[in-house]
């Protein structure tokens, strides 16, 4: 029954038929789940000698933990365990490195095509970014890491589904002291700025301009939020 509904919804969207189907967002970011996720993260630890490489994260179990399903979900997360996305993620920050690898292994690019009725109901990166906020270690993003997210994590044709506000810079705040910014979750900030910068990239063919915005606005704001307790 569920498969039939999902298939019918998918066909309706492809064919251009619009109809309202409520989407229920279930928050699975609890202390119990965070503890489970941290244990799963241990398999990504780099061996001290640096030669044996990293073990693969148990994608199937992590996916079950992070993504809840209900009768109102339009798309169910595929649990194939396939990790071959062709992307790479490298940063000196160990925690962010783990996060980036998980995003790749969970094939976040495919999941971003899900349509949501409201921007606040975006329920994918929420699960990936929220648990990292609770780890007792320094968290920081740099030019390389955020550039990977911008260039490889989102595609322009997927941004249409996210309903990014037209006045996003004003809403998100351009300084780290902005009250608007402080009230937002880090996953919203990252996702919104990535989307905004990708939209700018269409209108402006100036890479230095984009890099300047990333360096002066995007990275400081994200790091400011990640440092909050």
UniProtKB/Swiss-Prot annotation:
It is found in: Mitochondrion inner membrane. Residues 1-25 form a transit peptide. It is a peripheral membrane protein. Keywords: Activator, Membrane, Mitochondrion, Mitochondrion inner membrane, Transit peptide, Translation regulation. The keyword Ribonucleoprotein does not apply. GO terms for cellular component: mitochondrial inner membrane; mitochondrial ribosome; mitochondrion. Changing residue 124 to T: Loss of function, causes respiratory deficiency. Changing residue 98 to R: Loss of function, causes respiratory deficiency. The keyword Mitochondrion applies. GO terms for biological process: mitochondrial respiratory chain complex III assembly; positive regulation of mitochondrial translation. One of its GO terms (molecular function) is translation regulator activity. Present with 556 molecules/cell in log phase SD medium. CBS1 protein devoid of mitochondrial targeting sequences can enter mitochondria in vivo, possibly due to a bypass of the mitochondrial import system. mRNA-specific translational activator of cytochrome b. The cytochrome b (COB) leader RNA may represent the target sequence for CBS1 and CBS2, tethering the COB mRNA to the inner mitochondrial membrane, where cotranslational insertion of cytochrome b into the membrane can occur. This is Cytochrome b translational activator protein CBS1, mitochondrial. It comes from Saccharomyces cerevisiae (strain ATCC 204508 / S288c) (Baker's yeast).
